[in-house]
A protein has these predicted regions:
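Surface loops at the rim/top face of extracytoplasmic beta-rich domains
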Residues: 1-188
Length: 188
């Protein structure tokens, strides 16, 4: 409610942010099924608290026009899964500082750290949110203890939120219960 209208002339790096609101129970209803409004006072930023802070932003870095934030789905365990592309250029072999990306403003604005200016290789950096599937607690936005790189001392750190890494452009996800393990050797 406090954001201004998008500026179509804005060409700089920014972040992907996930915000949660509580729906308002419709008058005379006992369920939220037909809810059409939210309580703005319930706003909670799960990911991307600030555009930039030192040493860097808490959001998914967006340095190019594609391969950005993809899907949100809930796992069967209630966790929130978020897909995010590497946000590297699709028109060149982006190993960092690609001319058609906004890497320079991302560094200046604290959206990227210098070690993250590696283009598509961000997907391999456990301390970057780019090129990942993130697994979050849907109430707090913290990483989940069973995530592979979780740190109890830093539950909001990028590594604590990483569920899978090394992904170029995971722009769509779905949960298909009963489809089995993801291990190929199990044959299902």
């Amino acid at each position: 409610p406090t954001n201004s209208r998008p500026n179509p002339g804005y060409f700089k790096a920014t972040i992907g942010r996930i915000v949660r609101y509580q729906a308002v129970l419709p008058s005379g209803q006992t369920t939220y099924e037909n809810a059409t409004t939210v309580d703005y006072g319930s706003r909670r930023v799960l990911l991307g608290e600030t555009l930039a802070f030192q040493p860097k932003s808490g959001g998914i870095p967006l340095t190019h026009e594609s391969h950005g934030v993809g899907s949100l789905v809930f796992g069967q365990d209630g966790t929130l899964l978020v897909s995010a592309g590497d946000n590297a250029s699709y028109s060149s072999a982006d190993g960092g500082s690609a001319a058609e990306t906004y890497w320079s403003s991302a560094l200046t604005d604290g959206i990227l750290q210098a070690k993250e200016n590696v283009g598509a290789f961000r997907a391999q950096l456990v301390d970057s949110l780019a090129g990942k599937v993130l697994r979050l607690d849907p109430v707090t936005g913290n990483g989940v203890e069973s995530n592979p790189f979780y740190s109890a001392a830093e539950p909001r750190a990028a590594k604590s939120r990483v569920w899978a890494l090394g992904l170029r452009n995971p722009f769509r996800m779905t949960i298909r219960p009963g489809t089995g393990e993801h291990e190929p050797e199990l044959g299902n």
